[in-house]
Amino acid sequence: MKLDLKKDHNYQNGIYDFMAGTKSIVVANKEIDIEVDYAWDYASDPVITPTIIHEWKYLDKLVSKNVLKNARSILSIGGGGSSRTHEYLSPVTQEFTILNTGMWDLVNAQIPIETINTYLICATGEDMPILDSQIDAIEIPATLDHVIDARKVIEECYRVLNGGGKIGITLGNSDSWYRKVVSNLRIQVTSNHDHHHNFHFTSKDVENLLSEVGFTEVKTIGTAYLKLPKTIERKMKAPVLLAAHRFISNTMLRLLFGNSKGGMFLTYAMKPTAR
């Protein structure tokens, strides 16, 4: 993979740092702070239950199957930290790049086997220091709602992807059936993560964004349809219980509600090949 090394950067401890202490970017003539270091360890977060982690693993497998499979070069935007992408890489993968604005995530990134060239880049998704047409597959795992300019990030993805390359975006769904129920009942829900989210996407929002930028074959797979009280979810640790939860959540309830009403989703698409 070829980086744009003409951009100002430092290289230290295996990390290309293109941020140089930058803490904000300008969008529409307005300076907006960047999420520089979230430093979030989900294992110690009381909000995160075994069923949520199990749902994330299911999403990871969907990304591996529908986006990363047979890709020689992969870019993970917002990866690193506790991300498990390295476990799902294709046998043909030769290059794996993690791009994140947070140095903590890069320092703590899980690195794949030595036969895969790994690049760690501290930079924004809105201005990636990667030359055109370098990547076969891009994943944006639960990150697009944290960026400043979502459309610019998708445009940059389109630029660095090879023709025929794929992009996969995973997110929580603001239009899930159970969020609608909570809203209609006017139940107050507090979250210790809302202040980190700049957007609250639906799957349709992401589909439209990808299509507008030029991606084709846009598809969505809804997941995480079963939502139980936290007290119950915290007790569901046995593999048989988690397997039953996954079957109900991602098979039975998906058939009932359709692909756009799950609590999470994967939307993926392809950059068309040049004619």
Predicted regions: what they are:
Residues 5-69, 105, 112, 166-193:
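Conserved class I S-adenosyl-L-methionine
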Residues 75-127:
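Class I SAM-dependent methyltransferase SAM/SAH-binding core
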Residues 139:
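A conserved beta-strand element that flanks and buttresses the S-adenosyl-L-methionine
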Residues 142-146:
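Short catalytic micro-motifs in class I SAM-dependent methyltransferases
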Residues 151-166:
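A short glycine-rich, Lys/Arg-flanked "PGG" loop and its adjoining helix->strand segment in the class I
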Residues 182-186, 219-275:
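A C-terminal cap/extension of S-adenosyl-L-methionine-dependent methyltransferases
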Residues 187-205:
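Acceptor-substrate binding/catalytic loop of class I
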